[in-house]
């Protein structure tokens, strides 16, 4: 499952349908399954902030940089949780969600859309990703990509996906941020 993190919901559902049923999911099936998944997601208690994430975002903003969210999700509840956990940190009009793109990660379109929304060139941005598909998408978009291994995968998987740098945790990235940005 972690290898598919970052895909749009529709893409993930189609992969499962093809693997398990040998067919494409209909639009109605996708909507029904995504709806059920959203209900399940919202039934879970709210996750705590990842250690180092808030401090890193504060450093980013203090340097005059604009943090942006690029997610394969389209769940309003996820975006609301981001605002709750990181108040005032992200501008909704600069977020890229599943509804903004035709192709999800690992396609570069989500990050290319972020560049467009932010009025940036690839060499003016940095991607921070925790999943192989997101790392691959950032790399394919030509953006310097930092991988943070927050999951069960071997770090080499993230490097093989195209990460320029790899950190074992968000806290480790935060602690090294000033050195990286020199």
Predicted regions and their residues:
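Conserved acidic
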Residues: 1, 29, 45, 130
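A short hydrophobic beta-strand->loop->alpha-helix junction that borders the nucleotide-binding pocket
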Residues: 1-2, 98
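A metal-dependent, Asp-based hydrolase signature
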Residues: 3-41, 59
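Conserved donor sugar-nucleotide recognition element shared by glycan-biosynthetic enzymes
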Residues: 9, 49, 107
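Alpha-helical structural context
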Residues: 16-20, 44, 85, 117
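Asp-based, Mg2+/Mn2+-dependent phosphohydrolase catalytic module
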Residues: 27-28, 54-58, 74-182
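Short, acidic loop-to-helix structural element flanking the phosphoryl-transfer center
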Residues: 39-69
């Amino acid at each position: 499952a972690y290898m598919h993190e970052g895909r749009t919901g529709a893409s993930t559902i189609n992969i499962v349908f093809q693997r398990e049923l040998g067919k494409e999911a209909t639009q109605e099936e996708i909507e029904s399954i995504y709806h059920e998944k959203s209900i399940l997601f919202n039934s879970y208690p709210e996750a705590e902030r990842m250690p180092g994430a808030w401090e890193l975002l504060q450093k980013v903003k203090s340097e005059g940089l604009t943090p942006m969210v690029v997610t394969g999700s389209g769940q309003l509840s996820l975006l609301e949780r981001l605002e709750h956990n990181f108040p005032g940190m992200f501008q909704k009009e600069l977020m890229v969600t599943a509804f903004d793109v035709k192709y999800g990660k690992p396609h570069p379109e989500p990050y290319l859309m972020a560049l467009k929304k932010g009025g940036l060139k690839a060499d003016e941005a940095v991607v921070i990703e925790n999943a192989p598909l997101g790392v691959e998408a950032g790399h394919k978009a030509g953006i310097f990509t930092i991988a943070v291994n927050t999951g069960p995968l071997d770090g080499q998987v993230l490097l093989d996906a195209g990460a320029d740098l790899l950190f074992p945790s968000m806290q480790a990235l935060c602690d090294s941020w000033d050195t990286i940005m020199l």
